[in-house]
């Protein structure tokens, strides 16, 4: 598969699958495929949960309602065990993060050539279908969490309390203010960076492994047979990875917001 219709080398095949459909240049580059799939999956999540909630019954629930209730209960229990403040926004936020990130991660389970081949048939040269393999997407979510951390830190502690937290911890002495400020600022900035890079790194690596396995199908029958076995094994293992990464992103968000609500 190639944008030009010519056969690709293994290196070109990998590069093609890791290239976004984009417009613009430099800082103003927009990754159309990442935006399309992330927004589309977000809308699908909202529609699905809204529909289930609207049709929910106190009688014998259907399979979909049971599944949704199980997810909601799991997230709600996670919030109750981790978040020590009182904020009605946290549980819905955690639910949105967990399901949305999982759905974006789940796109990695689709065979790597299926959607790009359909896009090629429609005249679209590139199509990267896993939004969480795009740093722009993971950083945008992490920055959103970071802004909430700042907002609730100031709301709960006040401006003076937030400034005091940055300047008087961990060493509670005026002479250590520069050191405290440096340490606390680095710690604060590290939160969104670690959130974004952890999710991106794990999903990008998983996608790359699927691409490398797909390359084996174009070799000989022995490698093709091995590729089938490897793909099945990695598929099963990767289900755990995509679920775990969604859970970690959700839990770290809850922990960070819980820390923001702690008034020292």
UniProtKB/Swiss-Prot annotation:
CDD domains referenced in this protein's UniProt entry, alphabetically: ATP-synt_Fo_a_6 (cd00310)
UniProt entry tagged with the keyword Transmembrane helix: yes
Coiled-coil spans in chain: none
PROSITE patterns the record matches: ATPASE_A
GO cellular-component term (any): plasma membrane
Transmembrane segments: 32-52, 89-109, 134-154, 177-197, 208-228, 235-255
Pfam families (UniProt xref): ATP-synt_A
Cellular compartment(s): Cell inner membrane
Gene3D superfamilies, per database record: ATP synthase, F0 complex, subunit A
Topology of this chain in the membrane: Multi-pass membrane protein
Molecular function GO terms recorded: proton-transporting ATP synthase activity, rotational mechanism
UniProt keyword list: ATP synthesis, Cell inner membrane, Cell membrane, CF(0), Hydrogen ion transport, Ion transport, Membrane, Transmembrane, Transmembrane helix, Transport
InterPro entries, per the entry: ATP_syn_F0_a_bact/chloroplast (IPR045082), ATP_synth_F0_asu (IPR000568), ATP_synth_F0_asu_AS (IPR023011), F0_ATP_A_sf (IPR035908)
Gene Ontology biological process terms from the UniProt entry: proton motive force-driven plasma membrane ATP synthesis
Family to which this protein belongs: Belongs to the ATPase A chain family.
Function: Key component of the proton channel; it plays a direct role in the translocation of protons across the membrane.
Record's subunit section: F-type ATPases have 2 components, CF(1) - the catalytic core - and CF(0) - the membrane proton channel. CF(1) has five subunits: alpha(3), beta(3), gamma(1), delta(1), epsilon(1). CF(0) has three main subunits: a(1), b(2) and c(9-12). The alpha and beta chains form an alternating ring which encloses part of the gamma chain. CF(1) is attached to CF(0) by a central stalk formed by the gamma and epsilon chains, while a peripheral stalk is formed by the delta and b chains.
Designated name of the protein: ATP synthase subunit a
Origin species: Shewanella piezotolerans (strain WP3 / JCM 13877)
Upper lineage: Bacteria, Pseudomonadati, Pseudomonadota, Gammaproteobacteria, Alteromonadales
